[in-house]
Amino acid sequence: MTPPERLFLPRVRGTTLHLLLLGLLLVLLPGAQGLPGVGLTPSAAQTARQHPKMHLAHSTLKPAAHLIGDPSKQNSLLWRANTDRAFLQDGFSLSNNSLLVPTSGIYFVYSQVVFSGKAYSPKATSSPLYLAHEVQLFSSQYPFHVPLLSSQKMVYPGLQEPWLHSMYHGAAFQLTQGDQLSTHTDGIPHLVLSPSTVFFGAFAL
């Protein structure tokens, strides 16, 4: 009688065993390595191979806009897109110096301006300057421009040195498709117009 602790296995020749292992490996290898196309329909697999970034781009792009002030306009603040570091993305458009919101949702809206001026001479009358910058919303829900972000400052120019003041503000807002975002600025002749100092934008969260 065979002892219980010993098991007898049938002897298999080396060549036969190798062939069995090779066949098993060929069956399991595609699934184990996660080769492209496994688990996909033929059309889906072909699309993934031909356009590997197409689906990723559609899923990650969100509406966004970044505008800069036009330096060629000294007495007005006109916004520009598609130049330097300015852009319009995924539905945003610029019309009548206003951003048009492409889809309803929550957006982060921001803007910055920088003002500067020269020192006054002792004989000149040094009167205070009122500087202000405001981001406004015009919507079908309101018959007028509603202030969203606002900054004001009174500047008293000195007699010896030039002056420089900046204003930045930004916050998140619930916006509706078709809403218009614009700005109003007091003290435009004192603006320092460059891509890094005067800008305005919004992006979907």
UniProtKB/Swiss-Prot annotation:
Calcium found in the keyword field: no
GO CC terms of this entry = extracellular space; membrane
A GO molecular function annotation here is: tumor necrosis factor receptor binding
User: Pfam families given for it?
Assistant: TNF
* Subcellular localization(s) per the UniProt record: Secreted; Membrane
GO term, biological process aspect, one: cell surface receptor signaling pathway
Q: Which Cys-Cys disulphide bridges does the record give?
A: none
Q: Which InterPro entries match?
A: TNF, TNF_beta, TNF_CS, TNF_dom, Tumour_necrosis_fac-like_dom
Chief place where the protein resides: secreted
Q: Which keywords does this chain's UniProt record carry?
A: Cytokine, Glycoprotein, Membrane, Secreted, Signal
Which superkingdom, per the lineage?
Answer: Eukaryota
Domain named THD: which ranges?
63-205
Quaternary structure and interacting proteins, as annotated: Homotrimer, and heterotrimer of either two LTB and one LTA subunits or (less prevalent) two LTA and one LTB subunits. Interacts with TNFRSF14.
The role this protein plays is: Cytokine that in its homotrimeric form binds to TNFRSF1A/TNFR1, TNFRSF1B/TNFBR and TNFRSF14/HVEM. In its heterotrimeric form with LTB binds to TNFRSF3/LTBR. Lymphotoxin is produced by lymphocytes and is cytotoxic for a wide range of tumor cells in vitro and in vivo.
Please report which protein family the annotation says this sequence is part of. Answer: Belongs to the tumor necrosis factor family.
By its UniProt entry, which PANTHER family does this protein fall under?
Answer: LYMPHOTOXIN-ALPHA, TUMOR NECROSIS FACTOR FAMILY MEMBER
Under what name is this protein listed? Lymphotoxin-alpha
Q: Which organism is it from?
A: Pan troglodytes
